[in-house]
Amino acid sequence: MNIEIVKKQMERLLKYAHTPVFTVESCYNMAYGSISMASNIALELGDCQLSIAIDRLWDDTYRELFLNAYREELAQQ
């Protein structure tokens, strides 16, 4: 596992959040669950640095992107 795999998954879920088929809230929940699992798997494999990088990826980037998408969805309602 590496950080690029996690980034691809987050980008995929972020794209889904902008489609009418999925709600942003459900994509946010899937993304948060995926990030948490990836971070825990990295810890289980003994790669603390990767786990920290995954957590920071969520905290510094994708959390805010999903929240912005959610705000956009609310503004359209």
Task: Say what each PLM segment does.
Residues 1-4, 70-77:
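Short intrinsically disordered terminal tails
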Residues 1-32:
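N-terminal acidic leader/helix
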Residues 8, 48, 75-76:
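Intrinsically disordered, low-complexity regions enriched in polar/acidic and amide residues
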Residues 21-62:
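Acidic, low-complexity, intrinsically disordered interaction modules
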Residues 65-67:
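Alpha-helical linker/edge segments of TPR/alpha-solenoid repeat scaffolds
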